């Protein structure tokens, strides 16, 4: 009999939690593929700057 109130409280807590589908997306949510695309673009830009002028070192660090 003492376990019954605990069981009822647990059922109420489980029923009141929102499901994953109920959570709304915010503007800060970004797909992981987009993040990987940005990383690839940044790395390509950096590699292009490094190979722009291998004889003059000062322009490669810009």
Curated annotation (Swiss-Prot):
It comes from the Eukaryota. Contains 2 disulfide bonds that can be either 'C1-C3, C2-C4' or 'C1-C4, C2-C3', since these disulfide connectivities have been observed for conotoxins with cysteine framework V (for examples, see AC P0DQQ7 and AC P81755). Expressed by the venom duct. Residues 1-22 form the signal peptide. Keywords: Cleavage on pair of basic residues, Disulfide bond, Secreted, Signal, Toxin. The lineage of its organism: Eukaryota, Metazoa, Spiralia, Lophotrochozoa, Mollusca. This is Conotoxin Pn-B0151. Belongs to the conotoxin T superfamily. It comes from Conus pennaceus (Feathered cone). The cysteine framework is V (CC-CC). Its main location: secreted. Residues 23-48 form a propeptide. It is found in: Secreted. GO terms for cellular component: extracellular region. GO terms for molecular function: toxin activity.
């Amino acid at each position: 009999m003492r376990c019954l109130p605990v069981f009822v409280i647990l059922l109420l807590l489980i029923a009141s939690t929102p499901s994953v589908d109920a959570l709304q997306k915010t503007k800060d949510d970004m797909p992981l593929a987009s993040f990987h695309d940005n990383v690839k673009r940044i790395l390509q830009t950096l590699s292009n700057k490094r190979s722009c002028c291998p004889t003059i070192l000062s322009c490669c660090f810009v």
